C-alpha cells in the first residue's frame, strides 16, 4: 500500500500547505529557479500591465512540489491583483464555478490546481468564461428551465496539473501561456534551502545545504520538508547549525539515500531486477507485484527515477538501467 506521507513525496501532506506559506516567495526577485519560464512570464506580465489588460490565461504543468501554486501567487502579486485558489475536484457542479467567478474583480487571478480533474460539465462552462468573459447556465428544471447570461470581468485563469495529457484539447487550447515546470538543479535547491533556513532562524552551512539538496529529488517541497526534519535532529543534538554530518545522520536514519531514493523507490527497482531481470516489464505487472496502484507508480514514483536515469521506457515496457544496478550495489549480468 502506498504511503501517502513518504517524506520524499512531492505531494503536500494534510495541513502542510499552511505551514509552507511563510516559506513561499512572493515576487520574482524572491523566486529561485525555473529561470527560463520565470523570465518568459515576467515579459508577459510587463506587457499586460503596459496595456492595462489582464494577463492571458496560464497553464503550468509538471511533477508535484515544484512550485506551481507559488508561481501562481507570484503572478498575482506581480500583476498587483488578488488571487483566489481552488482545486478541480472541489468544483463539483457549474454553480460552484459561477460562485467563484462572481467573486473576482477585474484582472484577478483564479488558480485551479489539479485542473485535469474538473468535471466535464464544469469544464464546458469554463470555455466561454476564458474566451469571452461570460457564462450561460440553465436555471430551473423542465418547462421552467431557461438560460441565464452572466457577464464576467476580465480575469486570468492559472491552471496547474501534474498530468497535462489528461486535459481536453478544447481546454488546453484556451491557455495562451503554457509553462513546463522542471526539476530543480542542486545549486538552485541549495539556495532555496538556505533562504528557508534563514526564515526559520536556523543556521546552516553551504555543505549542509548541498547535502540536503542532493537528496531532495529536484523538488523544493521535499527540500523544505527535509530541512525541517534535519533541523529537529540538529536541535536535539545541540548543534548550533546544520552541517553535512547532521544531515547525513538524520537522512540516513530516515532512509533517504544520497540521491533521494527511499524505501518505496528501492522496493520498485529491486522487484524489477529480482523478478523480471531488470525488464522490460509492463506497468500493471510491476504494480501488481509490489502492491501499488499503477497510477501511483506513474505519477509519484517513476518520474524521478526516469529523471535520474534509473528507469527507461521502451516499446516493450520499463527497464532498469545500469546506473540503478550500480547505485543499489547489484551485479549487472545483461549483455549488450
From Swiss-Prot:
Catalytic activity annotated for this protein?
ATP + H2O = ADP + phosphate + H(+)
Keyword Hydrolase listed: yes
Q: Where is this region: Head domain (RuvB-H)?
A: 258-336
GO molecular function annotations of the record? ATP binding; ATP hydrolysis activity; four-way junction DNA binding; four-way junction helicase activity
Tell me the compartments it is located in: Cytoplasm
- Which GO BP terms sit in this record? DNA recombination; DNA repair
* Top-tier EC class: hydrolase
Its Gene Ontology cellular component terms are: cytoplasm; Holliday junction resolvase complex
Residue numbers spanned by region Large ATPase domain (RuvB-L): 1-184
Chain positions covered by the region annotation Small ATPAse domain (RuvB-S): 185-255
Is Hydrolase a UniProt keyword of this protein? yes
Check the record and name the InterPro entries matching this protein: AAA+_ATPase, AAA_lid_4, DNA_helicase_Holl-junc_RuvB, P-loop_NTPase, RuvB-like_N, RuvB_C, WH-like_DNA-bd_sf, WH_DNA-bd_sf
Recorded family membership? Belongs to the RuvB family.
Which comment does the entry carry about domains? Has 3 domains, the large (RuvB-L) and small ATPase (RuvB-S) domains and the C-terminal head (RuvB-H) domain. The head domain binds DNA, while the ATPase domains jointly bind ATP, ADP or are empty depending on the state of the subunit in the translocation cycle. During a single DNA translocation step the structure of each domain remains the same, but their relative positions change.
Known role: The RuvA-RuvB-RuvC complex processes Holliday junction (HJ) DNA during genetic recombination and DNA repair, while the RuvA-RuvB complex plays an important role in the rescue of blocked DNA replication forks via replication fork reversal (RFR). RuvA specifically binds to HJ cruciform DNA, conferring on it an open structure. The RuvB hexamer acts as an ATP-dependent pump, pulling dsDNA into and through the RuvAB complex. RuvB forms 2 homohexamers on either side of HJ DNA bound by 1 or 2 RuvA tetramers; 4 subunits per hexamer contact DNA at a time.
Q: How does it assemble?
A: Homohexamer. Forms an RuvA(8)-RuvB(12)-Holliday junction (HJ) complex. HJ DNA is sandwiched between 2 RuvA tetramers; dsDNA enters through RuvA and exits via RuvB. An RuvB hexamer assembles on each DNA strand where it exits the tetramer. Each RuvB hexamer is contacted by two RuvA subunits (via domain III) on 2 adjacent RuvB subunits; this complex drives branch migration. In the full resolvosome a probable DNA-RuvA(4)-RuvB(12)-RuvC(2) complex forms which resolves the HJ.
What protein does this entry describe? Holliday junction branch migration complex subunit RuvB
Amino acid at each position: 500500500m502506498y504511503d501517502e506521507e513518504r517524506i520524499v513525496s512531492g505531494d503536500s501532506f494534510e495541513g502542510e500547505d499552511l505551514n509552507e506559506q511563510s516559506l513561499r516567495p512572493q515576487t520574482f526577485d524572491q523566486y529561485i529557479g525555473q529561470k527560463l519560464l520565470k523570465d518568459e512570464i515576467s515579459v508577459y506580465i510587463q506587457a499586460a500591465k503596459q496595456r492595462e489588460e489582464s494577463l492571458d490565461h496560464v497553464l503550468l504543468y509538471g511533477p508535484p512540489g515544484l512550485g506551481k501554486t507559488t508561481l501562481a501567487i507570484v503572478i498575482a502579486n506581480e500583476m498587483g491583483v488578488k488571487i483566489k485558489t481552488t482545486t478541480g475536484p472541489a468544483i463539483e457542479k457549474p454553480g460552484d464555478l459561477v460562485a467563484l467567478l462572481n467573486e473576482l474583480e477585474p484582472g484577478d487571478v483564479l488558480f485551479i490546481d489539479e485542473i485535469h480533474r474538473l468535471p466535464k460539465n464544469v469544464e464546458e462552462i469554463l470555455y466561454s468564461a476564458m474566451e469571452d468573459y461570460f457564462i450561460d447556465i440553465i436555471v430551473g428544471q423542465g418547462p421552467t428551465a431557461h438560460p441565464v447570461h452572466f457577464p464576467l470581468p476580465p480575469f486570468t485563469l492559472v491552471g496547474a496539473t501534474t498530468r497535462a495529457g489528461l486535459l481536453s484539447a478544447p481546454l488546453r487550447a484556451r491557455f495562451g501561456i503554457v509553462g513546463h515546470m522542471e526539476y530543480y538543479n542542486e545549486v538552485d535547491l541549495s539556495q532555496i534551502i538556505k533562504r528557508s533556513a534563514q526564515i526559520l532562524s536556523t543556521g546552516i552551512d553551504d555543505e549542509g545545504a548541498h547535502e540536503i539538496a542532493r537528496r531532495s529529488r529536484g523538488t523544493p517541497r521535499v527540500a523544505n520538508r527535509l530541512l525541517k526534519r534535519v533541523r529537529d535532529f540538529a536541535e536535539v543534538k545541540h548543534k548550533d547549525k546544520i552541517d553535512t554530518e547532521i544531515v547525513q545522520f538524520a537522512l540516513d536514519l530516515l532512509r533517504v539515500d544520497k540521491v533521494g531514493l527511499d524505501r518505496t523507490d528501492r522496493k520498485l527497482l529491486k522487484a524489477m531486477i529480482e523478478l523480471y531481470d531488470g525488464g522490460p516489464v509492463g506497468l500493471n505487472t510491476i504494480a501488481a507485484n509490489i502492491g501499488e496502484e499503477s497510477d501511483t507508480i506513474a505519477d509519484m514514483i517513476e518520474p524521478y527515477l526516469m529523471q535520474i536515469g534509473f528507469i527507461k521506457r521502451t516499446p516493450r515496457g520499463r527497464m532498469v538501467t545500469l546506473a540503478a544496478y550500480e547505485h543499489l550495489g547489484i551485479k549487472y549480468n545483461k549483455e549488450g
